[in-house]
Design a protein with these regions (language model features):
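DG-centered beta-turn motif at the end of beta-strands
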Residues: 22-25, 126-143
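Von Willebrand factor type A / integrin I
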Residues: 155-253, 260-261
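VWA/integrin I-like adhesion module and closely mimicked acidic/polar interface patches used
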Residues: 136-194, 355-395
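Selective detector of the "anchor" transmembrane alpha-helix that sits immediately C-terminal
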Residues: 416-444
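Von Willebrand factor
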Residues: 69-128, 167-173
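Membrane-proximal extracellular "stem/stalk" segments
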Residues: 249-417
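…and closely analogous acidic/polar surface helices at protein-protein or active-site interfaces
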Residues: 14-21, 25-59, 143-159
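Cytoplasmic C-terminal tails of single-pass
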Residues: 444-500
Length: 500
């Protein structure tokens, strides 16, 4: 495993360094010496396609450190900002070094090259390493070199410091003076979190896509960006639904009655070169908040098979059922016109079985079909696709450990409550307010009424619930009080005696 410590995270806007590491051991002879070889122009194009403005880069070669006197491995040929002429000169200077004291070409130490590229090329910090190699060692290498080769693949697979790996197998049949080759591999290795993001950005860029006729092989993680859902029809039954910034928004659902949303979806296999040989499908719903499981989801068919790389499945019927939603109690619930339900639809692929695309195996047969293997490959004849797969580096076979996958889609359901309870409450409030207004008006207005003061009628202007004292023709005093309705009432007051 890698023992180098990751450096501190660079600022988000700071580009990371890149190292272009080219193998120059003996098995690279046809690529470096054959007449008409397009190897060097392709490496130049790789550097140009992945360059990042403002970022430094390095061009280096690797073989086996210590085999060539005075020549370290990796050997930096150029270090600095991208300059097409200087990069071209550096790549043109790549040669085939020979071991000390003989004519044999140098061997290759992949693990030493990886560690050296991190220490020297990346200076121990996050970055991207592009390793151009034919994945071969001499069969006469020492046990130490074989251990180093195995350690190289173990580091790529197991080290948490290496966050992302892609590979571009390149067919390039060439014949040199001593060897014939069918092609080589370009590995993109993201070191550290920032290096992984930079590598992902590079492989998504149009310039690099234009350089290769096939997508890169995603080696780590295997399922990186591989499976996605696409909706092409929303059978909403009168509802409004659509995708906004990756979220499925459904509006107009009836909260009181509940609703069922029917969608037609397709599962896209963005993996390469793995095909989905078989998988069982199950759809689940998880909701944000306390009422988890409020909605229910289902998908049919329940199985999928033979989904080719970079292809879409047939139509999948997705049903999302939302039961009735209770209006919250109290005034807040009465005033609420609806409720928003946030959740996630998750399509799970269980018993997932991936397999390599036969067309890919046929394409890479000349690259990996040689009898000379690196420490992570398996032997055997190369008569069929299974044998070719057995000769791939183990990283290319790590997909066999994947047995499940999932695809998630955020969903927001905007359910509306009926306005009638609010209308009824508002009407009652208006009626009450009107009655209160009429009552206040009646209280404030005086009415002329006829009041009986004993046997004598008298007309007087009275306000409701206010008392007046009147004197009758015979000199008696009366207290008069009127209400909102009915006649006013008169009460005779007791006269004070002369001694009072």
């Amino acid at each position: 495993m890698l023992v180098l410590a990751l450096g501190g995270h660079a600022r988000a806007e700071a580009p990371v360094r890149q190292v272009f590491l080219v193998q120059d051991s003996g098995w690279m002879e046809p690529f470096l010496t054959a007449e008409g070889s397009q190897f060097r122009p392709l490496v130049e194009a790789l550097v140009a396609a992945t360059r990042v403005p403002g970022a430094d880069m390095a061009v280096a070669t690797f073989d086996q450190d210590g085999q060539v006197p005075g020549r370290p491995s990796p050997r930096i040929l150029y270090d600095g900002a991208y300059d097409a002429a200087k990069v071209r000169a550096a790549i043109a200077s790549i040669d085939l070094p020979r071991k000390a004291g003989g004519t044999a070409y140098a061997d290759a130490d992949f693990n030493g090259a990886l560690l050296g590229a991190i220490r020297t090329g990346l200076r121990g910090r996050d970055g991207v390493i592009w390793m151009v190699t034919n994945n071969k060692n001499s069969p006469g290498n020492s046990a130490e070199v074989e251990r180093n080769t195995a350690a190289f693949y173990a580091a790529l697979r197991d080290s948490a410091a290496i966050s992302r790996i892609v590979a571009y197998p390149v067919r390039m049949p060439l014949k040199g003076r001593n060897f014939s080759e069918g092609g080589f591999v370009i590995y993109g290795i993201g070191y550290g979190a920032a290096g992984g993001r930079a590598l992902e950005s590079a492989v998504s860029a149009p310039a690099l896509k234009a350089l290769f006729s096939h997508p890169p092989v995603s080696l780590k993680p295997v399922l990186a960006g591989g499976l996605t859902l696409r909706f092409d029809r929303l059978d909403t039954g009168g509802l409004q639904a659509g995708l906004e910034n990756g979220v499925l928004i459904v509006s107009g659902a009836d909260a009181a009655a509940g609703t069922a949303l029917r969608l037609t979806a397709h599962l896209r296999n963005g993996l390469y070169p793995q095909r989905v040989a078989a998988a069982r499908l199950a759809l689940s719903w998880s909701e944000v908040g306390t009422e988890a499981g409020l909605a229910q989801a289902a998908v049919s068919p329940a199985e999928i098979a033979e989904l080719a790389p970079q292809a879409e499945s047939g139509p999948l019927s997705v049903v999302l059922t939302l039961p009735p939603i209770q209006r919250p109690s109290g005034l807040a619930g009465l005033l609420s016109d609806g409720r928003t339900v946030d959740g996630t639809l998750t399509l799970r692929l269980a018993d997932l079985r991936l397999a390599l695309d036969p067309a890919f195996l046929e394409r890479v047969r000349p690259i990996f079909g040689s009898g000379l293997l690196s420490g992570d490959q398996m032997g055997g004849p190369v008569g069929d696709a299974r044998a070719v797969e057995g000769r791939l580096p183990g990283l290319f076979r790590d997909y066999r450990g994947v047995s499940e996958a999932s695809v998630s889609l955020p969903v927001r359901i905007e359910a509306a409550f009926s306005p009638w309870p609010l209308i009824a409450a508002a009407s009652a409030a208006l009626a009450l307010a009107a009655a209160a207004g009429l009552g206040a008006l009646a209280l404030a207005r005086a009415r002329v009424q006829t009041v009986m003061l004993g046997t004598v009628p008298k007309r007087v202007s009275l306000r409701p619930y206010r008392t007046q004292t009147l004197r009758a023709p015979d000199g008696s005093r009366w207290q008069v009080r009127a209400g909102l309705w009915g006649p006013a009432r008169a009460t005779r007051l007791q006269e004070s005696g002369p001694g009072a």
